[in-house]
Regions:
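A polyanion-binding, active-site-adjacent surface
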Residues: 39, 43-56, 60-63, 75, ...
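Extended polybasic, low-complexity segments that bind anionic RNA or targeting/receptor surfaces
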Residues: 1-46, 93-209
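Glycine/serine-rich anion-binding loops at beta->alpha junctions
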Residues: 54-91
C-alpha cells in the first residue's frame, strides 16, 4: 500500500493517506502511455479543414465555350479544378474520422501509469476537503497559493461541486474533473494533481471493479 502525507491548508494535524498500490505504484510503460495519450488526443480532435470540391463551388452550369473552332483547349465547366475559383481535388474534408478505439483495460492501465508517475515525482497533493461555502475566485487563488501549487493544476473532485467549479473557471491553467471521469490525458498534461481524500476512494471504486 502506497502512502502519501495529506497536504494541509490550515494549521492542523497532517495524516498519512494510504493509496492503492495497484493504482499509484504501477511501473512506467512509455509505449502504453503514448498509445493511450495519442488515442485520447485523436478522439478530442475537431475537424475544421473542409475544402470545397467542384460540386460545392459556384458557377459552371454552362460550357465556357463551344467544343470546337475556337483554337483553345476544350472546357466543360468553370468549376473544374484547373480553373481559378474552381473546386479542389483531393482536398481535406470534414468527413474524416480520427477516432481511435482502445480496450477499456488499456485505457485504465494508462491512467494508472500516469498517476503512478505523478506520485513518484511528488506531483500529487492529497487534501482532506476542498468544499467551498461560496463562489469566490480570489479565495480559491489564495488556497492554491497556500498549497504551493505552481503551473497547471487538475483538481479531482469526488462529486460535482458547483461553487468550486465556478470559482476556478477563470483561473488560468486550473481545471476540475470528477474522480469517476479522470483520464490519462488530463493527468499527463497537468503539472500538479490535487485530489480530495474522498476522490481517491471514488477512483478506486470506479477503476478497480
Amino acid at each position: 500500500m502506497a502512502t502519501k502525507k495529506e497536504t494541509k491548508i490550515e494549521e492542523k494535524k497532517v495524516e498519512d493517506i494510504n493509496l492503492p498500490k495497484d493504482i499509484f505504484e504501477v511501473p512506467m510503460n512509455v509505449d502504453l502511455l503514448h498509445q493511450v495519450v495519442v488515442s485520447q488526443m485523436a478522439n478530442r480532435r475537431t475537424v475544421i479543414a473542409d475544402a470545397r470540391g467542384r460540386g460545392d463551388v459556384r458557377g459552371g452550369g454552362i460550357k465556357p465555350w463551344k467544343q470546337k473552332g475556337t483554337g483553345r483547349a476544350r472546357q466543360g465547366s468553370r468549376r473544374s479544378p484547373i480553373w481559378i475559383g474552381g473546386g479542389v481535388t483531393h482536398g481535406p474534408t470534414n468527413e474524416r474520422i480520427f477516432k481511435k478505439v482502445l480496450p477499456k483495460n488499456i485505457k485504465r492501465k494508462g491512467l494508472f501509469v500516469a498517476l503512478s508517475e505523478k506520485y513518484r515525482n511528488n506531483d500529487i497533493k492529497i487534501i482532506d476537503s476542498l468544499e467551498l461555502k461560496e463562489i469566490k475566485t480570489k479565495g480559491m487563488i489564495e488556497t492554491l497559493k497556500k498549497l504551493e501549487i505552481k503551473g497547471s493544476c487538475l483538481i479531482v473532485l469526488p462529486k460535482v461541486d458547483n461553487n468550486l467549479i465556478l470559482s476556478t473557471r477563470n483561473i488560468p491553467k486550473v481545471s476540475t474533473i470528477q474522480a469517476k471521469d479522470i483520464n490519462c490525458l488530463d493527468v499527463v498534461t497537468a503539472k500538479t494533481i490535487l485530489i480530495d481524500k474522498e476522490g481517491v476512494k471514488v477512483i478506486k471504486e470506479t477503476f478497480k471493479k
